[in-house]
Amino acid sequence: MENSCPYGLFLKAGTGEGRIKESSMAGKDRQIGFARVLTDGVTTFYLMDFVIEEKYRGQGFGTILMNRIMKENGHLYGMLHTKDAKAFYEKYGFRAIGDTKKTEEIYMEKPCS
């Protein structure tokens, strides 16, 4: 799993501030989000398991997490699938591909930049 890159988003204890931590040793901070990227590090990345705890959605925490992912991988060709966050991913250059009327899942891609 050396090409699997986990990202944890933690709510900093006592501040309400979201931050990315590299370690699973969060101490008193509360994990409120998670994402995993599979990549070859050269041409392609696949975004999967992007989750923000429901009560923290719509407050900018997903943006914090996605900004970090795109900072590290945004120059690569990207792929993902989603059911309900199409507009969110479009802000990062992803676009729907295929016939989105025939499936619940929306497959999206982002060209290399």
Regions found by a protein language model. Give the residues of each.
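Conserved active-site alpha-helix within GNAT-family acetyltransferase domains
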Residues: 75-110
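Short coil/turn motifs at secondary-structure junctions
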Residues: 40-42, 55, 85
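A conserved beta-strand-loop-helix scaffold within acyl/acetyltransferase catalytic domains
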Residues: 2-51
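Conserved acetyl-CoA pyrophosphate-binding loop and the N-cap/start of the following alpha-helix
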Residues: 55-65
